[in-house]
């Protein structure tokens, strides 16, 4: 029969619940084994039930605690298993840091697994080498391996040596910081005082704290309703002001440039940052550089829900001098409904220094982007003209190749067909103007129509306001002067052949017109016209009187000479063709084996040789060879050497050929010979080598084969003493002859031993069988 026990639960000062065993007598604390217990005493049960700190239980194999007892004393927590120890942790807010707890397996197997989220967001997805930097700054080279099963990156050889050298112990927690050296990742061990628990503590502080044990049981329902209603109002107000508060709380984002982001043109952005700033929808986004220039980029949504910058990001990074390993701080800005990411600061070796005098564009104005795009679209409407050659004007041009740091400051985004204006400012400085406020007059030509040839393409010439400040060169579309008074040019009818306008325009030597061509963009060089009346010297500056300035400000001309513009086009094309006349190629084994020489398509297009047909190749000795020019499937051009023949007519008229290719270097092959040279070139001296006898081969020099016109494989005849004949086979044009077995006996029969020399005389025959006479020296 089960006994009844009264259990009490006093709480100790430490907050732990203690269970005391007691019978009905208050003085007897110890349990008496052979003492009979009172059965079913209703008074005792009533007294104990009124006191919530004790209860009556039946003694059995298991002791069950009443639910009311546990809930009233705050002991209603469930018992759970202890959580698994964290081996590695990673926080997306600081993706440069990763925390490891060194496990015994890591040291035993000499491997350390990296978190997949850490490697993906930092672009570490390829096996290779990685540097490990210790506390003292020493570097250790380790292998970065890729597991085939799950795509996880691990540290291989070199990790165990790093652990021993830095005294890392099993069970301790260490934090590493990711750095980059060019394209090689670097994991730097942080000092002991750097505690990553501060980052984890912020996240854990968001969790609700457990309620302290309380002895209160009664809670008024009205108070609960009031709390719930106040909570609902507070949540509603939070949702209303979420859009206004989130940008201020998450106003900046620090991103590290990885090699993959520049190679593939993708920059991944944290989804939490983009969501809180309402930029989590794909579309277009504006990137604002440190110089104020705006770049349009694509905002993409990847399969896993992450946001990334796509097309336009790579050009933006190059223009702002961003390199691998640089850290940039981005600030989200909204212009109407267009999202904008502005670079607040950048740090690293790739940081570029921009000019202090470059004018910045306000984020609220999009005039620059719109006007440049309109000019670009208008210029693309006109087809490119055909090239004409004019060698007499080639010396009137010079090539200007801007430096890389200057090009990065240009915000014009020039394209083929656009017109830019330069001004000489003294000290060899040139100024770019793209329909800016410095232009006091714009002159247009008629657009191409059916009555005109493609040579009459519309061109835009600009005249510079003489009141331009004399400062350092700046590349910008706006100079800040009279911006409100400037109006874009309108299309008006043009009067032809206005001599007054020509004289006025040509008299101002401080400006000229240049046209952007295909070759100028490919070669990164722009051809500028140099007139004799404008010597560029550091000491010369344009002297313009006040009367001339007033006249130029008041007069706005709209006409231009059609013939002068046509001659300008001819000059531009002649200099571009002279710049791309040379091509350097490397002879590959495949080109000689298959008889095909591939030529760059860009070079062929710029020289108008992109159509299949025949082409003449001019040798160094003046000999001309007719070769087939082929067009492959992928659009590449190639030379077919199998059809190359020497043309007699081309040899007579060397200067009349339309397309000639001159070879700078080739083997000497005389084509015009007298009788004495003919006889001399028919003899060949060779040495009988052991390997030739063993392999049964005979190698004839390539030059000897070419001079005597032996270019076809077939059977040849060797004539020895007393009319002895030996038949051999010529395999290819490189001079390899298979003489077969018995070649040693043939040489000994003619008095030639191993290591001795002999002479072969080529006897020309009308038939295809070549004959060589064998002599001893």
From Swiss-Prot:
Residues 218-243, 370-388 have a biased composition (Basic and acidic residues). The keyword Cell inner membrane does not apply. Its main location: nucleus. Keywords: DNA-binding, Nucleus, Repeat, Transcription, Transcription regulation. Residues 344-368 have a biased composition (Polar residues). SUPFAM superfamilies: DNA-binding pseudobarrel domain. Gene3D superfamilies: DNA-binding pseudobarrel domain. Disulfide bonds: none annotated. One of its GO terms (molecular function) is DNA binding. CDD domains: B3_DNA. It is found in: Nucleus. This is B3 domain-containing protein REM-like 1. It comes from Arabidopsis thaliana. The lineage of its organism: Eukaryota, Viridiplantae, Streptophyta, Embryophyta, Tracheophyta.
């Amino acid at each position: 029969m089960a006994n009844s026990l009264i259990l009490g639960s006093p709480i100790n000062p430490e907050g732990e619940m203690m269970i005391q065993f007691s019978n009905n007598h208050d003085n007897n604390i110890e349990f008496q084994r052979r003492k009979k217990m009172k059965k079913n005493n209703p008074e005792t049960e009533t007294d104990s039930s009124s006191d919530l700190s004790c209860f009556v239980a039946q003694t059995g194999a298991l002791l069950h605690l009443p639910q009311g007892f546990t809930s009233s004393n705050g002991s209603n927590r469930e018992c759970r298993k202890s959580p698994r120890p964290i081996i590695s942790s990673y926080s997306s807010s600081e993706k440069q840091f990763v925390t490891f707890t060194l496990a015994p397996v890591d040291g035993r197997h000499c491997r350390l697994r990296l978190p997949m989220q850490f490697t993906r967001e930092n672009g570490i997805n390829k096996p290779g080498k990685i540097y490990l930097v210790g506390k003292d700054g020493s570097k250790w080279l380790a292998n970065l391996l890729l597991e085939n099963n799950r795509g996880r990156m691990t540290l291989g050889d070199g990790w165990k040596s790093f652990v021993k050298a830095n005294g890392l112990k099993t069970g301790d927690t260490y934090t590493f910081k990711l750095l980059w050296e060019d394209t090689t990742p670097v994991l730097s061990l942080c000092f002991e005082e750097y505690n990553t628990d501060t980052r984890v503590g912020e996240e854990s502080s968001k969790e609700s704290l457990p309620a302290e044990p309380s002895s209160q049981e009664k809670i008024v329902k009205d108070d609960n309703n009031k709390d719930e209603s106040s909570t609902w109002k507070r949540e509603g107000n939070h949702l209303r002001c979420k859009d206004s508060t989130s940008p201020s709380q998450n106003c900046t984002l620090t991103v590290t440039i990885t090699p993959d982001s520049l190679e593939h043109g993708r920059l991944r952005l944290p989804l939490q940052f983009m969501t809180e700033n309402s930029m989590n929808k794909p579309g277009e986004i504006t990137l604002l550089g440190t110089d104020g220039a705006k770049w349009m980029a694509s905002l993409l949504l990847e399969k896993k829900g992450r946001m990334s910058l796509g097309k336009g990001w790579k050009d933006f990074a190059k223009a702002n001098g961003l390199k691998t390993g640089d850290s940039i701080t981005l600030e989200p800005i909204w212009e109407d409904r267009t999202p904008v990411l502005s670079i607040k600061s950048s740090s690293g070796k790739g940081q570029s220094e921009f000019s202090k005098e470059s004018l910045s564009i306000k984020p609220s104005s999009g005039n620059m982007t719109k006007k440049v795009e309109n000019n670009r679209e208008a210029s693309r409407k006109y087809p490119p003209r055909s090239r004409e050659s004019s060698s007499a004007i080639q010396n009137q041009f010079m090539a200007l190749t801007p430096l890389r740091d200057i090009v990065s400051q240009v915000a014009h985004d020039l394209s083929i067909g656009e017109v830019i204006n330069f001004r000489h400012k003294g000290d060899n400085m040139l100024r770019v103007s793209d329909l800016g406020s410095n232009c006091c007059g714009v002159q247009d030509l008629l657009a191409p129509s059916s009555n005109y040839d493609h040579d009459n393409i519309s061109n835009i010439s600009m005249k510079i306001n003489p009141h331009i400040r004399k400062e350092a060169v700046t590349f910008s579309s706006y100079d800040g002067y009279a911006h409100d008074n400037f109006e874009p040019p309108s299309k008006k009818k043009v009067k032809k052949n206005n001599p007054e306008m020509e004289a006025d325009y040509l008299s101002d030597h401080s400006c000229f017109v240049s046209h952007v061509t295909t070759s100028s963009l490919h070669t990164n060089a722009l051809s500028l016209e140099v007139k004799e009346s404008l010597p560029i010297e550091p000491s010369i500056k344009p002297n313009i009187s006040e009367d001339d300035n007033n006249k130029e400000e008041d007069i706005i001309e709209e006409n231009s000479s059609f013939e002068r513009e046509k001659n300008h086009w001819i000059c531009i094309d002649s200099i571009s063709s002279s710049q791309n006349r040379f091509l350097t190629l490397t002879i590959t084994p495949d080109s000689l084996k298959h008889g095909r020489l591939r030529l760059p398509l860009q070079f062929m297009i710029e020289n108008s040789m992109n159509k299949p047909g025949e082409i003449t190749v001019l040798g160094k000795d003046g000999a001309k060879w007719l070769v087939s020019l082929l067009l492959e499937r992928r659009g590449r051009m190639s030379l077919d050497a199998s059809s190359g023949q020497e043309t007699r007519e081309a040899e007579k008229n060397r200067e009349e050929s339309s397309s000639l290719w001159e070879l700078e270097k080739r083997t000497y092959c005389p084509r015009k010979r007298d009788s004495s040279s003919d006889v001399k070139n028919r003899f060949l001296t060779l040495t009988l080598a052991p390997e030739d006898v063993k392999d049964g081969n005979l190698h004839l020099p390539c030059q000897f084969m070419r001079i005597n016109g032996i270019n076809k494989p077939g059977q040849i005849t060797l004539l020895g003493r007393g009319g002895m004949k030996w038949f051999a086979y010529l395999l290819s044009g490189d001079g390899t002859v298979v003489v077969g077995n018995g070649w040693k006996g043939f040489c000994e029969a003619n008095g030639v031993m191993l290591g001795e020399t002999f002479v072969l005389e080529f006897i020309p025959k009308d038939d295809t069988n070549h004959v060589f006479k064998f002599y001893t020296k």
